[in-house]
């Protein structure tokens, strides 16, 4: 539909409204406890701080409240040292009257890689048992084969399946493409269709046309909702256009955590529709009470806020979500290459095109972002290819929306070979993943595990094992929530052991907010070292020759220090295998004495939730392995050392 046609159609609708008699209550799902805090506070809000909010939200009358899934499962284990299943049970206790909703990543469940159908069924069963009613099910590639099993399981086990279409903008994503996706979802029997723009780049007239088209194509029998992040600042206008196009429900977030990388404010949307034929029936006074609770939460977790979470209209050009940008910045700081951020951002659309234009949301945003960073810092495109990109091209994530770059496909699959996406991703997953996870969890715990414990391990084995061991020892210590250091005074001759990461300085009567974002790797004594400092929001790189070293709290340096303390030497020899960026060792694939070929994969390192293959820099014999699974490493650490041997050797 053209904009002029849409405007004329809306005029006619308003004439009908003026006659009276038309009423359509718009339903509201509030996402504050999950997506709101994920967008604005890095998902770091602890369960104890969420419970008072959830208890108050139970009295408002939302259609549902999203409290679980997405990154919460991972973050609970990795940073908060909480059992995500216990979180869900505790929330359900204080919200008996409201449907609880979770974000479900299709065949990936809440992880980053496809799992077996058996694992999907097990997870859905336990989620419903522990309190979830509504499942928002999506696949990052819009390969609906990846959500079909989940939708079937949810319906069979008594849940409510909201199947999602993930919006993006590319030459292959046309109006007709969205309608085709919608018809596939209607055919699989979903209870609702969610149209999701996770990046925040859809425009109002397009919103109207697509929502109206979906409603008409599905015969008005399938309820439709809009999930629209606000990165470009147009989401609340999209909400209004969706309402006029016939949408049935809107996703919102309470105002202290709304807008920008998050969603339109619940209060704003409710007020916008109040007194109209679309009145939500929600009491604004109750929303104000909720907002006061959220304000206090935001104050406590202020350290996790970032400038990338605000409105940024540049997203309309580069299509990169705020969270993805902040991840890339963190990677480049730790790799001592922040000066390459613009190159990395420019590389993102190139990688996205090479991979067939996937929408940039989990896990495709991580796959594209990490590869773009590697392409830039290695100095050559696809010189280093992540395991995830290889798996993606081999079809292990599903079928991309468009064709894979021929050059990239041949680099991974071999000359003249093309990707085969005819096989469903789940059929390439380990069919025995549940059984293996059960046995390994039992061995770790030394007893029969619960289904929930097996699921923790099946989805996040390293993090779950760490959690189980720490829980057994009574050593579950969550990541500290440090208060912001407002001012810092350093007396002459006194240098603190750990310098503050955030402070104010006064220079000629003017105040400047300063934040140390990162520090480069250690240099030789007396040599300058790069510090990345943000002054009033502007990032600067400075070189300092320190006489006494002060380590900023929260910077990447402690990881390097940890590596040194564990006896991991710095890479100095041609045969030293290194990681392309800071990360955690997942697997070491060789042992001392093994013969290896140049380019052979010798280890796997996880960085930014993606697995990177570490290759042998030369052919020879593994002389020494310096790391083990669980070790944190930086790019200048030697993971293992290979000794070149002159005589011809045979490789097994």
Curated annotation (Swiss-Prot):
Its EC number is 6.4.1.7. The keyword Endoplasmic reticulum does not apply. It catalyses: hydrogencarbonate + 2-oxoglutarate + ATP = (S)-oxalosuccinate + ADP + phosphate + H(+). InterPro entries: Aldolase_TIM (IPR013785), Biotin_BS (IPR001882), Biotin_lipoyl (IPR000089), Carboxylase_cons_dom (IPR003379), PCB-like (IPR055268), PYR_CT (IPR000891), Single_hybrid_motif (IPR011053). The modification N6-carboxylysine is found at residue 196. Keywords: ATP-binding, Biotin, Ligase, Magnesium, Metal-binding, Nucleotide-binding. Residues 26-288 form the Pyruvate carboxyltransferase domain. The modification N6-biotinyllysine is found at residue 609. It holds the Pfam family HMGL-like. A divalent metal cation binds at residues 35, 196, 227, 229. Gene3D superfamilies: 2.40.50.100, Aldolase class I. GO terms for biological process: gluconeogenesis. Biotinylated. GO terms for molecular function: 2-oxoglutarate carboxylase activity; ATP binding; metal ion binding; pyruvate carboxylase activity. Residues 563-643 form the Biotinyl-binding domain. Substrate binds at residues 34-38, 105, 362. Its cofactor is Mg(2+); Mn(2+); Co(2+). It comes from the Bacteria. GO terms for cellular component: cytoplasm. It is an enzyme of class 6 (ligase). Heterohexadecamer of 8 large subunits and 8 small subunits. NCBIfam families: PRK09282.1. This is 2-oxoglutarate carboxylase large subunit. It comes from Hydrogenobacter thermophilus (strain DSM 6534 / IAM 12695 / TK-6).
């Amino acid at each position: 539909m053209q904009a002029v046609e849409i405007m004329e159609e809306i005029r006619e609708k308003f004439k009908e409204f003026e006659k009276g008699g038309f009423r359509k209550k718009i339903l509201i799902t509030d996402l504050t406890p999950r997506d709101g805090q994920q967008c604005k506070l890095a998902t770091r809000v602890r369960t104890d701080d969420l419970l008072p909010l959830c208890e108050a939200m139970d009295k408002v009358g939302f259609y549902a409240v999203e409290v679980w899934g997405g990154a919460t499962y991972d973050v609970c284990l990795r940073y908060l040292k909480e059992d995500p299943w216990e979180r869900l049970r505790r929330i359900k206790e204080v919200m008996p009257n409201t449907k609880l909703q979770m974000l479900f990543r299709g065949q990936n469940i809440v992880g980053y890689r496809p799992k077996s159908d058996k694992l999907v069924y097990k997870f859905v069963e336990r989620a419903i048992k522990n309190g979830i009613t509504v499942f928002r099910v999506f696949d990052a590639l819009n390969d609906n084969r990846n959500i079909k099993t989940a939708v079937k399981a949810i319906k069979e086990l008594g849940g409510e399946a909201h199947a999602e279409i993930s919006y993006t903008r590319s030459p292959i994503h046309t109006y007709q493409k969205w309608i085709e996706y919608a018809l596939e979802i209607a055919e699989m029997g979903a209870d609702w269709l969610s149209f999701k723009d996770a990046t925040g780049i859809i425009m109002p007239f397009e919103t109207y046309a697509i929502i109206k088209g979906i409603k008409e194509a599905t015969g008005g029998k399938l309820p439709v909702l809009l999930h629209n992040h606000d990165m470009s600042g147009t989401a609340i206008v999209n909400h209004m256009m969706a309402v006029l196009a016939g949408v049935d429900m809107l996703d919102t977030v309470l105002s202290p955590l709304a807008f920008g990388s998050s969603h339109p404010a619940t209060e704003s949307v409710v007020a916008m529709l109040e007194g109209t034929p679309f009145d939500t029936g929600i009491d604004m006074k109750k929303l104000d009470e909720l907002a006061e609770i959220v304000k206090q939460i935001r104050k406590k977790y202020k350290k996790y806020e970032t400038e990338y979470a605000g409105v940024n209209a540049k997203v309309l050009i580069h299509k990169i979500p705020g969270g993805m940008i902040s991840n890339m910045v963190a990677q480049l700081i730790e790799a001592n290459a922040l000066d390459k951020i613009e190159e990395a951002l420019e590389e993102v659309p190139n990688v996205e095109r090479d991979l067939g234009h996937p929408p940039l949301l989990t896990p495709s945003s991580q796959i594209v972002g990490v590869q773009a960073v590697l392409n830039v810092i290695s100095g050559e495109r696809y010189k280093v290819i992540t395991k995830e990109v290889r798996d993606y091209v081999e079809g292990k994530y599903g079928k991309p929306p468009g064709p894979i770059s021929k050059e990239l496909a041949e680099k991974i699959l071999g000359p003249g070979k093309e990707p085969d996406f005819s096989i469903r991703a789940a059929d390439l997953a380990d069919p025995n993943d549940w059984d293996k996870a059960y046995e390994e969890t039992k061995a770790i715990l030394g007893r029969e595990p619960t289904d929930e414990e097996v699921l923790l391990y099946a989805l996040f084995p390293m993090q779950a094992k760490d959690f189980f061991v720490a829980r057994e020892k009574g050593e579950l210590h969550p990541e500290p929530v440090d208060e912001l250091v407002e001012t810092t005074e350093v007396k002459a001759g006194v240098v603190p052991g750990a310098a503050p990461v955030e402070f104010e300085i006064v220079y000629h009567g003017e105040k400047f907010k300063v934040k140390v974002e990162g520090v480069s790797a250690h240099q030789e004594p007396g040599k300058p070292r790069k510090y990345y400092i943000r002054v009033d929001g502007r990032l600067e790189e400075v070189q300092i020759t320190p006489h006494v070293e002060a380590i900023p709290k929260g910077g990447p340096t402690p990881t390097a220090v940890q590596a040194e303390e564990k006896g991991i030497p710095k890479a100095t020899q041609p045969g030293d295998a290194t990681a392309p960026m800071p990360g955690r060792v997942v697997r070491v694939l060789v042992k001392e004495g093994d013969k290896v070929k140049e380019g052979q994969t010798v280890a796997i390192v996880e960085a930014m939730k993606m697995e990177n293959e570490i290759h042998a820099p030369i052919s020879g014999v593994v002389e020494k392995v310096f790391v083990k699974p669980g070790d944190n490493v930086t790019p200048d650490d030697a993971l293992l050392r290979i000794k070149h041997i002159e005589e011809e050797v045979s490789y097994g």
